[in-house]
A protein has these predicted regions:
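Short runs within selected transmembrane alpha-helices of multi-pass transporters and secretion channels
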Residues: 58-61, 65, 129-147, 155-163, ...
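Helix-terminus/linker motif at the lipid-water interface of multi-pass membrane proteins
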Residues: 19, 23-41, 107-116, 174-178, ...
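Short alpha-helical transmembrane segments in multi-pass integral membrane proteins
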Residues: 1-14, 68-134, 178-261, 317-386, ...
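Small-residue hotspots at the loop-to-helix junctions and early N-terminal turns
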Residues: 37-48, 122, 126, 286-301, ...
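Transmembrane helical elements of multi-pass membrane transporters/channels
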Residues: 9-28, 128, 139, 162, ...
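Small-residue-rich hydrophobic transmembrane alpha-helices
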Residues: 40-99, 103, 136-150, 154-155, ...
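Hydrophobic transmembrane alpha-helices of multi-pass small-molecule transporters
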Residues: 52-55, 166-170, 212-216, 301-304, ...
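N-terminal transmembrane alpha-helices
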Residues: 2-30, 34-35, 48-67, 91-99, ...
Length: 472
């Protein structure tokens, strides 16, 4: 039976890993801000566009964790290894498919950017990170192999290693080095030219490559060890006779695509809808935009752990279904939602308690009136707390639905609510009452409707009849 303690044991490395990624992005942008204003302006649109493309393939590859989870729950460790091989093939193909997206992205950036200097930097960052996204997919395939089996600490420590390397390389690559190290008989000169935004991109790609390499080595050693143990025992794992079966690998590969593609589309639609909202809020006013951006930064740091809870819910539900215990799957989802909402509410209360201090970090950088900045900031933080609870609950419950294979509903429901309900309301508010609090208030209705729909879907139990991995 899934207990709160077992949930926390699985989830905390995932949640901290997501926070770790958020901090890394913040540090990246801080270094670029000291490089040039154009670099800071370029990294956000280029990064968003890259992740709109790469996020789809990352989500598809990452869905292999659900298959690993279900097969692990069923005791089919050979099937888990086959899932990893299938995920690696998807990762390779995904990396190749990035090539034609380079000119597509460059055209989109040229269409939306007026400054030649900023456009050149956007293209540089976009090209390097998009072509280097192969390592992201490889890393995700290996990470999913461990996450689905509940070994989340390995993923966390490797993630921490990669992000620490990224932060260490950032200043060296962005600003360059010119060191003369005197030794006993001669002097060693170390020189690296300043690469600006290209350096930040290279640092990110190198860090991802290191994460992929470490996880891949550990995964292959684990697979070899498990395979040898199964062979020497004389009985093996369930499905061990098909360990090298191409037919089973292809079957799992196409099943991952069947359920993973809607999950990838969900990621794209989520990013697109939120990007449109951010662009709409940019037309309210300079002070309002500065405050909104500051609060969005805070919100990102708070919501990042919920992505870890969602992945944990997906894994726990998948493992329970693999064991044939769908009641425990429901219990795991319910308890993970409760824990996640509690954490989200607690973090929001802490932010509100220290709101003057938190907002003060951004007010000085914005060069705005402190009183006006703090007044509007407080209002937006209160609204953020209101939607944070429902947003956290929906993110985690959507993760549970994905773990049960109900990815089409999650994708279609987001499409309908975001583009047929929320964004039309946002544009109407912009036309009739163009204030930042009014625009932010629409987020509460948006995430509330999303959550209610997810709850109804979960309680109807459609997910109980979905078969994800064959043989479970």
């Amino acid at each position: 039976m899934t207990t709160f303690r077992s949930i926390l044991k699985l989830v905390w490395p995932l949640a901290l890993g997501m926070v770790n990624n958020a901090v890394m992005q913040f540090v990246d942008r801080t270094f670029l801000a000291h490089s040039s204003l154009a670099a800071l302006e370029a990294v956000l649109p280029a990064g968003i566009l890259m992740w709109i493309f790469a996020g789809f393939f990352q989500s598809v590859v990452g869905y292999s964790s659900v298959f690993v989870g279900q097969l692990h729950g069923a005791g089919d460790e050979a099937g888990c290894r086959t899932c990893y091989r299938a995920a690696k093939w998807i990762a390779v193909v995904s990396g190749v498919l990035m090539l034609p997206l380079v000119p597509v992205g460059e055209w989109m950036l040229a269409w939306s950017t007026t400054s030649a200097e900023t456009l050149a930097m956007e293209k540089t960052y976009y090209d390097i990170t998009l072509l280097g996204s192969f390592f992201i997919y490889g890393q995700m395939a290996a990470a999913s192999y461990f996450t689905g089996r509940g070994r989340t600490r390995i993923v966390f420590w490797v993630n921490l290693l990669g992000n620490a390397l990224n932060i260490a390389l950032d200043p060296l690559f962005i600003f360059g080095i010119d060191w003369n190290l005197p030794l006993s008989a001669f002097t060693v000169s170390l020189r690296l030219p300043a690469m600006g935004i290209a350096g930040a991109a290279y640092a990110t790609v190198i860090a991802m490559a290191v994460q992929w390499a470490v996880l891949a080595v550990v995964a292959h050693r684990s697979m070899a060890r498990d395979g040898e143990a199964a062979t020497s025992s004389g009985c093996g794992d369930k499905g061990d006779a098909t360990f090298l079966s191409r037919e089973r690998t292809l079957d799992i590969l196409f099943r991952i695509l069947r359920f993973g593609v809607p999950s990838g589309l969900y990621t794209i639609l989520n990013m697109l809808s939120f990007t449109v909202f951010v662009f709409v809020t940019g037309g309210v006013g300079e002070l309002e935009l500065a405050v909104s951006n500051a609060c969005f930064t805070i919100n990102y740091l708070l919501i990042a752990p919920m992505e870890g809870f969602a992945l944990g819910a997906s894994t726990l539900v998948a493992q329970a279904i693999g064991r044939g215990d769908r009641e425990d799957a429901a219990r795991a989802a319910r308890r993970t939602v409760l824990l996640g909402v509690g954490v989200a509410l607690g973090l929001s209360v802490v932010v509100l308690a220290f709101a003057p201090l938190v907002l003060g970090l951004f007010a000085s950088q914005a060069g705005a009136s402190s009183a006006e900045f703090h007044a509007l900031g407080w209002t937006l933080l209160v609204l953020m707390t209101a939607w944070q609870v429902f947003d956290a609950a929906d993110i985690i419950l959507s993760g549970a639905l994905k773990g049960a294979g109900d990815t089409k509903f999650v994708m279609v429901w987001l499409l309908v609510v975001a583009f047929a309900f929320w964004l039309p309301v946002v544009f109407a508010v912009r036309h009739f009452h163009n204030t930042m609090p009014a625009l932010w208030a629409t987020m509460i209705g948006y995430v509330l409707v999303l959550f209610v729909g997810s709850v109804v879907r979960w309680r109807r139990g459609t997910w109980r009849g979905i078969e994800v991995a064959s043989g479970t």
